[in-house]
Amino acid sequence: MTQLAIGKPTPLGAHYDGQGVNFTLFSAHAERVELCVFDANGQEHRYDLPGHSGDIWHGYLPDARPGLRYGYRVHGPWQPAEGHRFNPAKLLIDPCARQIDGEFKDNPLLHAGHNEPDYRDNAAIVPKCVVVVDHYDWEDDAPPRTPWGSTIIYEAHVKGLTYLHPEIPVEIRGTYKALGHPVMINYLKQLGITALELLPVAQFASEPRLQRMGLSNYWGYNPVAMFALHPAYACSPETALDEFRDAIKALHKAGIEVILDIVLNHSAELDLDGPLFSLRGIDNRSYYWIREDGDYHNWTGCGNTLNLSHPAVVDYASACLRYWVETCHVDGFRFDLAAVMGRTPEFRQDAPLFTAIQNCPVLSQVKLIAEPWDIAPGGYQVGNFPPLFAEWNDHFRDAARRFWLHYDLPLGVFAGRFAASSDVFKRNGRLPSAAINLVTAHDGFTLRDCVCFNHKHNEANGEENRDGTNNNYSNNHGKEGLGGTLDLVERRRDSIHALLTTLLLSQGTPMLLAGDEHGHSQHGNNNAYCQDNQLTWLDWSQASSGLTAFTAALIHLRKRIPALMENRWWEEGDGNVRWLNRYAQPLSTDEWQNGPKQLQILLSDRFLIAINATLEVTEIVLPAGEWHAIPPFAGEDNPVITAVWQGPAHGLCVFQR
C-alpha cells in the first residue's frame, strides 16, 4: 500500500499539485491523526499523517487525484470535563474541505457520546470530503466595486428567489444558475439593485429535531463545512462551484455585486447532545468557547460558540473568507451574530479576528456587514464595530415601524434615524453608509405581513408558536390576516408605501428584503427558517407590478438626490437637509419632542419629502418655490405646481422644485 510522505504544513485542507495530494489538519490536543480515503467501492484505507509541525498534522499522498473521497479519524483524550471529546470511531469532515459528497441525515451513529464515548463506527453513513482541482476561467471578470454611498442591497435566498419564477427555465429554477439568468439580472437592474446579498451558501445541515418533524433548515444558518458550497442549490453537485461562479460573473457584468451571508459564530454540531461532524472531534477545546465544567458557552442560541480569539481559529476563519473572495470573487460578507467575532470573551474592537481582517490586503478591500449582536451579556454592540464594518441598524427598523404603524415615536427620534443614526454611527471616522437601514429582513415579518398581522403565526414551525420575536411593531389595520375590504387594502398599501419611502430615501445604506417589492407574504410567520415551501418561495405570478414599479421609482429617485449619494454626514447649513414643520418653518424644540407627526424634509434644496403621519387629512404648506410631485407619487411630466399639499392620513409625498 502507498505510504504517505511528510508533506507540508500549509495550506490547510487537501490540495492537489499535479502529482498527488497534500493533506493538513489543525489539532493542538490530538495524539494521532488518521487520513481515511475511500475507493470507488466505499472501501476505507487509513494512513497516519506522518508530519507534525506545531499544531498542524500533515502528509502527502502520491498519485492521489481530484475526486478522491476522504475524512479523518482523530485520536486523543476523552475528558469531557476538560473539553476534550476525541473519538476515533467517528469519521470527521475536514473543516477546510472544498466539496462534500453525501447528505447529513439524522442518525444515532453521528453522536460521539455525552459522558461516555460512543465507540460505534459511523464511516458508512458520514458524507465524505472530496479533493478538487480548480481550472475555472474568470475571463475578464472584475468586481464592480460600487461605492458604499451608491449601494442598494437586496437580501435574497438562492432557492426562494427563483424557484417559482415563470420566465426562468424549469430545470434551473431555485439554483445558482438561475441567479445569473438574464431574466433575473434584468429584473435586479430595472429595480435599481447594486448588490445581491445571499443567505448562506456554505454547506449546511438540518438540525436532527427538524428532520424528525419532516422539516429542514431552509435559511442555512447551520454550517458544517464553511469552505464548501451547498450542493442542493446546484443543477449538478459536481459542478456547483462553477455554476455559482458563472452566476457571479454574469452579475458582475451587469454591475451587480454579490455579498455572502456567512456564519462564523457556531457550527451544526449544536450542543453536547448534537451530532459530531467535524470540529468537536478534531479539537473541541480549541475551536469552541468551553465553560469550566466542559460544556459550551451558548452565546449564539445554537448550542455552541466558535472561539474566534484562538489563533488557529482566527487563521481558519480568515482563510475561509479569503477563499470566497479569491476563488469565487464575492464582493463582501454579512456576518451572522457578528458580536461573536469580537469576543475575547468580552467584546473588543481590536479582537484578533477584527485585526486579522484589518491587516489582510484581500479582506480589508471588500464590503463587510455585521449583524452587531449575539445573545450573551454585553452582546448588543450596534455602533461599536471597527471602522471597516457597516452594521445592520435595528434602530432604524424599529423607528420606521413605530412611526408609521404604532404612531408613538417623536419626530426628533424619527429624524435621527432618517439621518443615518448619526448618534450611533458617527464615530471613529465612519461614514453614513455604515448604517445598513432596513425595515424587514429574512428573520421577522415581511413588509406585507407588517401591515396585515399584529401577532406572529409560527405554528407550522413545530414549536407551538413559541419561536420568533413578539416585538414586531406591526399593525394589521383592524383585521388579522390577508385580504379585507377595499378601504383596508388601501390603508395597508399606504403604510407599505410610507415604509418603503422612508427606507429608500433615508441617509445610510438601504437593504430591501426580496419579495417586499411585490407584496410577498409568509402568512404571519416571522421565523420561517424551517419552511422550504411556498410560504417562503417568492410567487412571481402573484407579484404586484404596481408595488414593484413604486419601489423601482423610489430607488431611481434616490440616485438623483446628492444628499443621499455623497455619503457625507449632514451638517447644519450645508444645504443637504432642512427639517421643517407643516408651515415650512424650522421645528421648535417642543415640536421635535411633542409635536404632531407632521414633517417636511428638504434634501439638496430641491427634493422635498412631505409627511403627515397623523390620523387626519392635514394641509402642509410647502416652502417657497414651484413644487411638482414626482414619481412614484405622480407621472413623469406632472405639470401641476403645488404650494399646499393636502396630506392624507398616514401619507407622504415627494416633490421637486
Swiss-Prot record:
GO BP terms: glycogen catabolic process
Site (Transition state stabilizer): D443
Reactions mediated catalytically: Hydrolysis of (1->6)-alpha-D-glucosidic linkages to branches with degrees of polymerization of three or four glucose residues in limit dextrin
GO molecular function, one term: hydrolase activity, hydrolyzing O-glycosyl compounds
Source taxon at top rank: Bacteria
Active site: D336 (nucleophile), E371 (proton donor)
Name listed for the protein in its UniProt record: Glycogen debranching enzyme
Annotated metabolic or biological route of this protein: Glycan degradation; glycogen degradation
NCBIfam families: glgX_debranch, PRK03705.1
Enzyme class: hydrolase
Organism: Escherichia coli O81 (strain ED1a)
EC nos: 3.2.1.196
Chain residue ranges for the region called Disordered: 460-479
Taxon lineage: Bacteria, Pseudomonadati, Pseudomonadota, Gammaproteobacteria, Enterobacterales
Family under the similarity heading: Belongs to the glycosyl hydrolase 13 family.
Keywords recorded for this protein, A-Z: Carbohydrate metabolism, Glycogen metabolism, Glycosidase, Hydrolase
